[in-house]
Amino acid sequence: MEEKEKQKQRAAEAAARHLQDDMTIGLGTGSTAYYLILEAGRMAKAGMRLKAVTTSKATEELARSHHISVILPEETDCVDLAIDGVDEIDREFRAVKGGGGALLREKIVASKAKEVIWIMDESKLVERLGAFSLAVEILPFGYEIGRASCRER
C-alpha cells in the first residue's frame, strides 16, 4: 500500500475510534471514507449497533455490505457524529467538499450532525483553496429538509 493510502487508512481508523454503540452516524463518500466504512463495518460485525445516514448511493451500498444499518435523514432527528473526507483544506481549516458529486447529501448529513470529523491525507492540504472543481447539485434525496431550511431563511 502506498503512503497516501496508508494516511487515508490511519485517518479513518482514528476517526472510527469516536464511534460508540447505538450511535446514528453520517458516513461520507470518497476514497478516505471508504476506509472508515470498512472499520465501522468491522465494529458493527463485532456487535456495535450503528445506524448510518449516507452521503451517496455508493456509500449506502458499501455500508450495507459491511453490516451497517442504513436509514434516511428523515428517519432521525439528529446524527450523533458525521465523518467525511474533504477535497481541499487550508491551514485555517477552511475546506472544500463535494467534488465527488455528493455535495447536497453531504450538506444534509452534516447539517443534522451534532459533531463532524473531516478526514484526509496530506495531499488535501493546500495554501489556497480553489484549485478543485466543485459541482452544483439538485436531487430528490432530502429535498423536503432543504426546502424547509430555505423557507426559514
Task: Name what the model sees in each region.
Residues 1-86:
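N-terminal active-site beta-alpha-beta segment that forms phosphate/nucleotide-binding
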Residues 3-6, 57-153:
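Conserved phosphate- and dinucleotide-binding cores of soluble alpha/beta proteins
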